[in-house]
């Protein structure tokens, strides 16, 4: 029960403290076929763990198909409860949103693709993925940026964790036109949520054997908002004398990540900064296709890719890299205390990459998504006995 209890321990501790044109192609027959194929192959296992699946937009349905194929081959005792929610495929409504929320609340665990948000203003400022985070209070986004053996990038042997507060900050959806041609966007920072994410970061570092936490901010300019966030991090840091604590301004952090990312261990930051740093750091180890991510509340766990990109231009072309989603699915199994299957799948993915014979285009190869899935399945083997 160690893996499952780790996350639950963290959450208990926490309680203590856009171009729309490309998206019209999503309504093509290829996209519909991928979604249909994915839905038709639901895993049905007696006594299995129920998990909500939300394929999302872009290549999401294709990535979920990869997860299902690998889970089937590995005989993973998980039953997917699939729902489709999209703001670009006429598959969004308050009723569908409530159905998704109901499923996630019932199952407690979900695996999701990116729900693309059109840049046009259509009356609702809060996107569906933002509403899901808020309604489920998925306050902590965790992205583990780690180099993959056998896949050389500009920086190798990286191992750092980005923890992002994702229920307030700049993504408050509080915008209005105060005068013609003048838009005001409100950034919300609260002591309660700043302390909560800081405590989550230090608890995470403690449980995972990490030695340092760096708070990323812009308090030199936003003296009250980011100043409060920084103050909360400093106060929480005093409760963890064995964990080294540092602070860094966001612009300097971006430069330092490119020049010397090895100085970082665990980074904690507000919403917008985390969104930017997640993507920057993913680029250091190979891009959006190889970095897994997860989001937590006190009750729920959601698994996804670390860099949230729908990759619309790849829809139906069989070129998407399923590495990040498969690794995220492996993390989900560890959360469910299915260590045997989690290790089997993660090791198979890493072996495929280390051997280097099967790589998708984003990794410099010519293999298709299907090729990668078949290779992973071919590398599955019994674990722990």
From Swiss-Prot:
Its main location: mitochondrion. Keywords: Acetylation, Mitochondrion, Transit peptide, Tricarboxylic acid cycle. Residues 1-34 form a transit peptide. GO terms for cellular component: isocitrate dehydrogenase complex (NAD+); mitochondrion. The keyword Acetylation applies. InterPro entries: IsoCit/isopropylmalate_DH_CS, Isocitrate_DH_NAD, IsoPropMal-DH-like_dom. It comes from the Eukaryota. One of its GO terms (biological process) is isocitrate metabolic process. GO terms for molecular function: enzyme activator activity; magnesium ion binding; NAD binding; oxidoreductase activity, acting on the CH-OH group of donors, NAD or NADP as acceptor. The heterotetramer and the heterodimer composed of IDH3A and IDH3G subunits can be allosterically activated by citrate (CIT) or/and ADP, and the two activators can act independently or synergistically. The heterodimer composed of IDH3A and IDH3B subunits cannot be allosterically regulated and the allosteric regulation of the heterotetramer is through the IDH3G subunit and not the IDH3B subunit. It is found in: Mitochondrion. The modification N6-acetyllysine is found at residue 199. The keyword NADP does not apply. Transmembrane segments: none annotated. Pfam families: Iso_dh. Belongs to the isocitrate and isopropylmalate dehydrogenases family. PANTHER family: DECARBOXYLATING DEHYDROGENASES-ISOCITRATE, ISOPROPYLMALATE, TARTRATE, ISOCITRATE DEHYDROGENASE [NAD] SUBUNIT BETA, MITOCHONDRIAL. NCBIfam families: mito_nad_idh. Plays a structural role to facilitate the assembly and ensure the full activity of the enzyme catalyzing the decarboxylation of isocitrate (ICT) into alpha-ketoglutarate. The heterodimer composed of the alpha (IDH3A) and beta (IDH3B) subunits and the heterodimer composed of the alpha (IDH3A) and gamma (IDH3G) subunits, have considerable basal activity but the full activity of the heterotetramer (containing two subunits of IDH3A, one of IDH3B and one of IDH3G) requires the assembly and cooperative function of both heterodimers. Heterooligomer of subunits alpha (IDH3A), beta (IDH3B), and gamma (IDH3G) in the apparent ratio of 2:1:1. The heterodimer containing one IDH3A and one IDH3B subunit and the heterodimer containing one IDH3A and one IDH3G subunit assemble into a heterotetramer (which contains two subunits of IDH3A, one of IDH3B and one of IDH3G) and further into the heterooctamer. This is Isocitrate dehydrogenase [NAD] subunit beta, mitochondrial. It comes from Rattus norvegicus (Rat).
């Amino acid at each position: 029960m160690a893996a499952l209890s780790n996350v639950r321990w963290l959450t208990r501790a926490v309680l203590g403290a856009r171009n729309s044109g490309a998206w019209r192609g999503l309504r093509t027959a290829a996209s519909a076929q991928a979604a249909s194929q994915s839905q038709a192959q639901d895993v049905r296992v007696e006594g299995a763990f129920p998990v909500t699946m939300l394929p999302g937009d872009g290549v999401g349905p294709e990535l979920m198909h990869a997860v299902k194929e690998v889970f089937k081959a590995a005989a993973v005792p998980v039953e997917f409860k699939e729902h489709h929610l999209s703001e670009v495929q006429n598959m969004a409504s308050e009723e569908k949103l409530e159905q998704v929320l109901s499923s996630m609340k019932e199952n407690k665990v979900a695996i999701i693709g990116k729900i693309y948000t059109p840049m046009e203003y259509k009356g609702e400022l809060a996107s569906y993925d933002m509403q899901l985070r808020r309604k489920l209070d998925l306050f902590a986004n965790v992205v583990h940026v780690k180099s993959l053996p056998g896949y050389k990038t500009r920086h190798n042997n990286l191992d750092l964790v980005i923890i992002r507060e994702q229920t307030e900050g700049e993504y408050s959806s509080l915008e209005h036109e105060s005068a013609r041609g003048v838009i005001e966007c409100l950034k919300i920072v609260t002591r309660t949520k700043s302390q909560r994410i800081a405590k989550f970061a230090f608890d995470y570092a403690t449980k995972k054997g990490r030695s340092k936490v760096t708070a990323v901010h812009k308090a030199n300019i936003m003296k009250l908002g980011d100043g409060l966030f920084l103050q909360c991090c400093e106060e929480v840091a005093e409760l963890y004398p064995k964990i080294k604590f540092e602070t860094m301004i966001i612009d300097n952090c971006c430069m330092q990540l490119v020049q010397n990312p090895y100085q970082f261990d665990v980074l904690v930051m507000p919403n917008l900064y985390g969104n930017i740093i997640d993507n920057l750091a993913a680029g250091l180890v190979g891009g959006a296709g190889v970095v897994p991510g997860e989001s937590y509340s006190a009750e729920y766990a959601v698994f996804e890719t670390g860099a949230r990109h729908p990759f619309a231009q790849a829809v139906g072309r069989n070129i998407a890299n399923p590495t990040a989603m498969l690794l995220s699915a492996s993390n989900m199994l560890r959360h469910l205390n299915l260590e045997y299957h989690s290790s089997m799948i993660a090791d198979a993915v890493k072996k495929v990459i280390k051997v280097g014979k099967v790589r998708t285009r984003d990794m410099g190869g010519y293999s298709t998504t299907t090729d990668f899935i078949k290779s992973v399945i071919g590398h599955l083997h019994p674990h722990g006995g």
